[in-house]
Amino acid sequence: RDSRECTPWENYQLTKESPQLAVELASRAAEGAKELFAGELKVSVIIPSKDNPEVLEKCLHSLTRRSEGRIPVEILLVDNGSSAENKQKTEELIGRIRESGVPVRYIYEPAEFNFSTMCNRGAELAEGKFLLFLNDDIEVCGNGWLDKMVIRAMQPYVGSVGLKLYYPDSVKI
């Protein structure tokens, strides 16, 4: 295995093979861009949630408003047993989100709370090439963020990508 595959391009030393390496990296980037612009990529957003429809609503609205890029998104909401009242509120919320054209799947499986099990269940059902795990109390606050994350995730030396989480009305993380 070529050790260069695991090294970010900024760290490559200039050698006699640098031109060949530059062509290879440009070729990989072009292939990724081709997939990106052809709409062949999809991001599966997995959101574990239970008994939190008001907070979830803010999350979903910010996600759908701020994810208008080139990359298709599907949302998988994994609920491990909300009350009947909160389940109904969540289903109504999902209906409104679906009306806006965003595909949402609601996985309702009552069980003891286990965050990793909920995430894994969403991952099992996901159809996207990329998985985005998002807590239900997160609000997206910038445009173009998803495109930027996917472009970085497509690099051959990247295993995962994350963002800074800020407290509301603050620059503190």
Where in the sequence are the language-model features?
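A conserved hydrophobic helix/loop-capping motif in glycosyltransferases and polysaccharide synthases
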Residues: V43-V55, C59, R66, V78, ...
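Active-site acidic Asp-centered loop
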Residues: N80, L134-D136
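Non-catalytic membrane-proximal stalk/linker segments that position and tether the catalytic domains
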Residues: R1-L41
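Glycine-rich, basic loop-to-helix element that forms the pyrophosphate-binding segment
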Residues: E109-A126
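Conserved donor NDP-sugar-binding/catalytic core segment of glycosyltransferases
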Residues: I138-I173
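Short aromatic/hydrophobic "clamp" motif used to bind/position activated sugar donors
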Residues: L131
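Acidic donor-binding segment of Leloir-type glycosyltransferases
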Residues: T64-Y108
